[in-house]
Regions:
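Bacterial N-terminal signal peptides that target proteins for export
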Residues: 1-8
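Bacterial N-terminal signal peptides
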Residues: 8-16
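Sec/Tat signal peptide C-region and signal peptidase I cleavage site
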Residues: 15-23
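N-terminal "mature-domain start" segment
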Residues: 22-60, 123-125, 133-136, 195-202
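Surface-exposed amphipathic alpha-helical segments
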Residues: 32, 44, 98, 103, ...
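Short, solvent-exposed coil/turn segments at beta-strand boundaries
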Residues: 39, 43, 68-72, 137, ...
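Conserved polar/disulfide-associated segments of primarily extracytoplasmic proteins
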Residues: 50-151, 225, 236, 242
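Disordered, low-complexity segments in secreted/periplasmic proteins that are enriched in proline
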Residues: 208-242
């Protein structure tokens, strides 16, 4: 019995050492290309891909990923700067051909991402879903329980026409990953942290193709870009042709 206890203790020590070895040193990670900084477990792996927007435009997306033991962290950055050109190049039905829709694609990007990646994902239970801001940049924050009982802490922001999706997925009993989620900073062209004196809402890019669409920034309400023929209100709805 005594020998068994010694073996069990040795195994427990080895497991603890292995778990400790898996933990990574956290650093302040800065990315000048996508203009953000935050605390992360080391350097990321980087994947270039494409993001499909609500109105079927395809935007360049960069996904930065980290792991720390069983926990997974990511920042996805989608650049909506060319929304006008990309939307105009697509073939849309008459219901969705109004120039304002490329702007609506940007303005609705936070809610679109939240719904497509989390709210509508099969087997996911949303336990928190509300307006949020960090450094006065407005966005949305969600907490979800995944089918494998891990928990994802999500924050989504839109800054300078870039969509930022932060996801920290941790084991069932792990503490909330505050060090990752609450350390986000937005950087200017010189790599300095951006600070605002009041709430920041994204400013739309200047139209370049001769049709001004819905106006600039978020300084006033969007005009009706043309209601769909079926009388629907707002957005395109599930399954609606574009």
């Amino acid at each position: 019995m005594h020998r068994f206890r010694l073996v069990a203790a040795a195994c427990a020590l080895l497991m603890a050492q292995a778990a400790f070895a898996q933990q990574k040193e956290w650093i302040e990670y800065k990315n000048l290309d996508d203009h953000f900084a935050l605390n992360t477990p080391g350097q990321p792996t980087v994947e270039k891909t494409m993001w499909v927007s609500e109105y079927d435009s395809k935007f360049p997306e960069t996904v930065y990923r980290w792991t720390d033991g069983p926990n997974r962290y990511s920042v996805s950055v989608v650049d909506y700067s060319d929304s006008e050109a990309l939307y105009t190049a697509n073939h849309h039905t008459d219901d969705f051909s109004a120039p304002a829709y490329w702007q609506i694609d940007i303005l609705g990007s936070i809610q679109w991402a939240a719904s497509q990646l989390y709210r509508l994902k099969p087997g996911v239970k949303v336990t928190f879903d509300n307006f949020h801001y960090i450094n006065l940049v407005t966005g949305q924050q969600l907490t979800v329980i995944n089918p494998d009982m891990t928990r994802s802490y999500v924050a989504i922001y839109l800054h300078e026409n870039r969509l930022y999706i932060l996801d920290a997925t941790v084991t069932r009993n792990a503490p909330a990953p505050i060090a990752f989620q609450q350390s986000l900073e937005f950087l200017d062209a010189e790599g300095k942290s951006v600070r605002y004196r009041t709430y920041y809402f994204d400013k739309l890019p200047e139209p370049k193709l001769g049709r001004r669409g819905a106006g600039q920034g978020t300084q006033g309400p969007l005009p009706d870009p043309g209601a769909p023929a079926n009388g629907g209100q707002g957005g395109r709805g599930a399954g609606a042709p574009r």
